[in-house]
């Protein structure tokens, strides 16, 4: 049985359209809704986000990120034997976005491909799932992607949510290895909190039933997130006998700089050891962690042999952590 699942390549993609807080404030003002750069930055740390054009889908973003990860890994794409896509904004009700990505990438080896839906915890859940497949010995090269077009589900009459989210994709290639890779994973959920972060609508009989836009109780999410993120991070570290002092980099879900800083502080980690891209990306849900990872890998901050702690929290309520060696 393979001992580890190791990241051998990363990639990411942001749509070209960059929307600043000033741009968004101008757009909302036309609807009679007040906001400002200061208001958004002070509450979230977000200065800009990227939004996809109307004809661009989650799979389009995913393919761009995957191409980079495959190139970085230096492997034949036909050797990929499993594709997992974490998304809450799939191209269609079905088939899965993962199958669409498989076709667009030209992977013709009939490997399994499926979507995983855990909202902003999605990438952590997907990474943990891929880890289990590799450790079992059933698969050797797994493409894991987080991709979202949250701009499609934003209510632009609600300034408390529409200013927070962006679109994008991030990807990693995990490969079976005898060298340390993923050291531990931890995942949890609590369905009692379904209503604090959700899109409470559906399509039935060709009609939309309920609210098709994102709804969030920001205060409830904040309180729960800081609490569970600290606990799940410590759970993952304890499982691998790693202390906070041994963590080189913390990559939290990029939702809100205050939640991120609160989590780092509880763990006793200085801000300099936290990768933060929320100011430029906004909250990209399942894409946020792999996007931040790829940015830090490509700018040289994250290097081979370093210990990285990733943690995410999202609707459901879901949360999880992955501790790994690069």
Curated annotation (Swiss-Prot):
Pfam family membership, one? ACP_syn_III
- Is Oxidoreductase set as a keyword in this record? no
Entry's EC annotation: 2.3.1.180
Q: In which pathway does it act?
A: Lipid metabolism; fatty acid biosynthesis
What is stated about domains?
Answer: The last Arg residue of the ACP-binding site is essential for the weak association between ACP/AcpP and FabH.
Q: Where is this region: ACP-binding?
A: 254-258
According to its UniProt entry, the protein's GO biological process terms are: fatty acid biosynthetic process; secondary metabolite biosynthetic process
Q: A Gene Ontology CC term for this entry?
A: cytoplasm
Q: What does this protein do?
A: Catalyzes the condensation reaction of fatty acid synthesis by the addition to an acyl acceptor of two carbons from malonyl-ACP. Catalyzes the first condensation reaction which initiates fatty acid synthesis and may therefore play a role in governing the total rate of fatty acid production. Possesses both acetoacetyl-ACP synthase and acetyl transacylase activities. Its substrate specificity determines the biosynthesis of branched-chain and/or straight-chain of fatty acids.
Q: Which family does it belong to?
A: Belongs to the thiolase-like superfamily. FabH family.
The annotated subunit structure for this chain is:
Homodimer.
Q: Could you say which enzyme class this protein belongs to?
A: transferase
Annotated active site? 120, 253, 283
| Cell compartments where the protein resides | Cytoplasm
Q: Which GO terms describe its molecular function?
A: 3-oxoacyl-[acyl-carrier-protein] synthase activity; beta-ketoacyl-acyl-carrier-protein synthase III activity
Top-down, what is the taxonomic lineage of the species of origin?
Answer: Bacteria, Pseudomonadati, Pseudomonadota, Betaproteobacteria, Burkholderiales
Q: Which UniProt keywords apply?
A: Acyltransferase, Cytoplasm, Fatty acid biosynthesis, Fatty acid metabolism, Lipid biosynthesis, Lipid metabolism, Multifunctional enzyme, Transferase
Q: Which reaction does it catalyse?
A: malonyl-[ACP] + acetyl-CoA + H(+) = 3-oxobutanoyl-[ACP] + CO2 + CoA
Q: Decide whether keyword Acyltransferase is in the record.
A: yes
Q: What is its main location?
A: cytoplasm
Protein's name in the database = Beta-ketoacyl-[acyl-carrier-protein] synthase III
């Amino acid at each position: 049985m393979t001992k580890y699942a190791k990241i051998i390549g990363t990639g990411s993609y942001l749509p070209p359209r960059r929307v600043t807080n000033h741009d968004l404030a101008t757009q909302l003002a036309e609807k009679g809704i007040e906001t400002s750069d200061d208001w958004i930055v002070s509450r979230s740390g977000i200065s800009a986000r990227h939004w996809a054009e109307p004809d661009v889908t989650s799979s389009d973003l995913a393919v761009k990120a995957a191409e980079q990860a495959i190139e970085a890994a230096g492997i034949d794409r036909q050797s990929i034997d499993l594709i997992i896509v974490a998304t809450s904004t799939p191209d269609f009700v079905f088939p899965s976005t993962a199958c669409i990505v498989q076709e667009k990438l030209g992977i013709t080896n009939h490997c399994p491909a499926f979507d995983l839906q855990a909202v902003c915890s999605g990438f952590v859940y997907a990474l943990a799932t891929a880890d289990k497949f590799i450790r079992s010995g059933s698969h050797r090269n797994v493409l894991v992607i987080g991709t979202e077009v949250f701009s499609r589900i934003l209510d632009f009459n609600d300034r408390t949510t529409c200013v927070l989210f962006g679109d994008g994709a991030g990807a990693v290639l995990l490969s079976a290895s005898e060298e340390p890779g993923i050291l531990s994973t931890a995942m949890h959920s609590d369905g009692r909190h379904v209503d604090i972060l959700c899109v409470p609508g559906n399509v039935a009989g060709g009609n939309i039933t309920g609210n098709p836009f994102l709804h969030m109780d920001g205060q409830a999410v904040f309180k729960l997130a800081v609490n569970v993120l600290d606990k799940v991070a410590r759970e993952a570290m304890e499982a691998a006998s790693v202390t906070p002092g041994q963590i080189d980099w913390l990559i939290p879900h990029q939702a809100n700089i205050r939640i991120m800083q609160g989590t780092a502080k509880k763990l006793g980690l200085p801000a300099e050891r936290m990768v933060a891209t929320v100011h430029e990306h906004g909250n990209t849900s399942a894409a946020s962690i792999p996007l931040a990872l790829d940015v830090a890998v490509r700018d040289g901050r994250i290097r081979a042999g370093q210990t990285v702690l990733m943690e995410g929290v999202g609707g459901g309520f879901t949360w999880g952590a992955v501790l790994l060696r690069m």
